[in-house]
Amino acid sequence: KEPGVFQAKELQLLQTILDNQKRVPLTLSLGDMGITTDIVSKIYDWAKPYATEGELASYIPELANVDPDKSAIVIGDLQGDMIAVGNGVDVKVSIQSVVKPFLYIYALQKGLAPSDISYIEPTAMHFNTDAVLQPESHKSRPGHPLNNAGAISSSGAIDNFDDFLAFMRCLTGNPKLAVMEDVYLSEMATNANNRAIAMRLVATG
C-alpha cells in the first residue's frame, strides 16, 4: 500500500492493550502476542519508504558513513525467539542512546540511589542539552536518566569497564557485544558537549 494509507490491522492487539491501559506480560512469547514474521514484514514494507525522509547523524562523523539504504526490524522475546526482517539485519550497528536504560540499571545494581542519579520526570529540553541542572527550577540533578546528563550521571557507577561490558553481554544475551572502536574514536573527537555536562555534574557533587 502507499505510505500513509497502511491500516496496520496487524497492530490491533497492541492498540487494544493501549486503549484498555493493559500491559503485555513479559513472559509471553512472540506467538502468544500474535507477532509473526508476516506481520513484521508488512510493517517493514509500509515503513521503509519513510526511511528516506530522515538524515544521518552528522554530529558524530562516523555515523554519517553508514549506509542509509539499510534498515531492519528485529523483535525478540524472553524465550529466545526472534523475528528479523529487512536488508540490514546482518549490519553491525552502534546502539548509541539505547545504552541509557542499561546504564541506569547498572548504576542501581551498584548501589546508587535513584535520587543520586537524576530526577525521573518529563522534560521539554533537548536530549543533549548542557542545561543539566535547571537552576530556574531549583533542581541540582538531571531531569531523568534517559537524556545525556542522566546517562552521564549513571555512568559514574562504572569503575571497571570490563565489568560493565560483562553486565551488558549478560543482560542482552549477546556474548559478542563489543565496543565499535571507529565510533568510539569519532565520538571522543567530538564530545565537548558531553564533557561539559560531566564537568557540571562533578562541580555540583
Where do the protein language model's features map onto the residues?
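A short, well-structured edge-of-sheet supersecondary motif
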Residues: K48-V85
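Active-site-adjacent helix/loop patches that line small-molecule binding or acyl-intermediate pockets
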Residues: R23-T52, Q109-G205
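Active-site SXXK
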Residues: G80, S94-P114
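Short, conserved micro-motifs enriched in small and acidic residues
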Residues: K70, K92-P101, H144-P145
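Acidic Ca2+-chelating loop motifs
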Residues: K1-Q15
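Glycine/charged-rich beta-loop-alpha catalytic/anionic-binding loops adjacent to active sites
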Residues: D81-D90, A131-S137
